């Protein structure tokens, strides 16, 4: 089973014929500061590292899907492992294993984005490029009203709306 870590919301259609365009919204794990998926895990497999990255320890995961149901963004899924017959939960980890080996490397989704629409960095550093972009007045976060404090920010497309 293939897992899609960055599904795209259908987008918002704007304009009138013949000047119609659609804005697409790629989604991924929001790596919330207050994730609902971490404290509910009965085995402690769902974790959050000191940098705020939410991840799953596959060795501890029993595939109960409690965290799948707890995620308000629907960004967790289960997958059959090749070497095991049971299921475990998978999700975007910002390529945690890769960044542990190569700390100066961005996650693959950032590295391979042809339009350079994805930016990864330290949002706690006020001088970082990502912090400067976040401080723009037009950025927004999905389902911010839930209180999970999502750490993925969106900048509307030029001329686009939220």
Where are these regions (language model features)?
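Non-ligating segments of multi-cofactor redox enzymes
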Residues: 1-162
């Amino acid at each position: 089973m293939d897992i899609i870590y960055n599904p795209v919301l259908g987008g918002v259609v704007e304009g009138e014929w013949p000047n119609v365009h659609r804005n697409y919204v790629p989604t991924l794990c929001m790596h919330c500061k207050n994730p609902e998926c971490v404290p509910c895990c009965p085995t402690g497999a769902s974790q959050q590292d000191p940098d705020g990255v939410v991840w799953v320890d596959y060795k501890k995961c029993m595939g109960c899907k409690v965290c799948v149901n707890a995620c308000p963004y629907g960004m967790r899924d289960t997958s059959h492992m090749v070497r095991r017959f049971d299921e475990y939960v998978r999700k975007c980890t910002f390529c945690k294993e890769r960044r542990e080996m190569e700390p100066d490397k961005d996650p693959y989704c950032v590295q391979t984005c042809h339009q350079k629409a994805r930016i990864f960095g330290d949002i706690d550093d006020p001088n970082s490029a990502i912090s400067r972009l976040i401080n723009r007045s037009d950025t927004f976060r999905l389902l911010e009203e839930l209180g999970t404090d999502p750490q993925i920010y969106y900048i509307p497309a030029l001329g686009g709306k939220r």
